[in-house]
């Protein structure tokens, strides 16, 4: 069985979002939305939009901290020449399915740009 983190990296590498790696009750904490986004279908909508915006030719991981059931993935990318630095915090269960995903983005100018650009894909 592939690990949750291997599955995540495969999705990023292939620029796809795969619901089979998610628990039915997954929660996504977006930097733009006050309440967590719940359920595979809703989370898929946001991840597909984020994938189109953030996962571009400039996207790269700069660090990774992986534990038994969670990981911090630090990334960098650019949109319209604006530097973006962010963190994915991912939690998974014993079945290697994602149960929680949190995204943090900085600086504020980048956060605003990502929000505006993603809203066009939602």
Which positions does each model-derived feature cover?
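C-terminal and inter-domain tail/linker signature
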Residues: 1-122
């Amino acid at each position: 069985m592939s690990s949750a983190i291997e599955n995540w990296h495969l999705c990023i590498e292939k620029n796809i979002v795969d619901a089979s790696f998610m628990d039915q009750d997954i929660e996504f904490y977006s930097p733009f939305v006050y309440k967590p986004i719940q359920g595979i279908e809703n989370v898929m909508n946001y991840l597909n939009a984020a994938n189109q915006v953030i996962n571009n030719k400039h996207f790269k991981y700069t660090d990774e901290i992986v534990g038994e059931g969670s990981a911090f993935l630090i990334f960098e990318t650019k949109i319209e020449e604006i530097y973006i630095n962010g963190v994915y915090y991912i939690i998974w269960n014993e079945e290697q399915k994602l149960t929680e995903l949190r995204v943090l983005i900085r600086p504020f100018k980048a956060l605003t740009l990502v929000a505006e650009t993603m809203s066009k894909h939602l």
